[in-house]
From Swiss-Prot:
Heterodimer of a small and a large chain linked by disulfide bonds. It is found in: Vacuole, Aleurone grain. One of its GO terms (cellular component) is aleurone grain. Its main location: other. The keyword Disulfide bond applies. Belongs to the 2S seed storage albumins family. This is 2S seed storage albumin protein. Keywords: Cleavage on pair of basic residues, Disulfide bond, Seed storage protein, Storage protein, Vacuole. It comes from Matteuccia struthiopteris. The lineage of its organism: Eukaryota, Viridiplantae, Streptophyta, Embryophyta, Tracheophyta. It comes from the Eukaryota. GO terms for molecular function: nutrient reservoir activity. This is a 2S seed storage protein.
Amino acid sequence: DQASMQRASRLLHQCDLRPRDCARRSSERGQGERWRQQLRACDEDSEPRQQCCQNLQRISSQDRCRA
């Protein structure tokens, strides 16, 4: 939904990632679902912020979508 997308993109900025590039590339490479699950975990604060960023960056670097 809209609100969680906004939270997600704020989170990604804090992690130095560009949400759109990431989402697009990761879905092209079949990683989209993993990426979304990770974002959701971050959004629900089930993981510490730092851990979140690292996980997202790991997925991102595999998809080469670093900001």
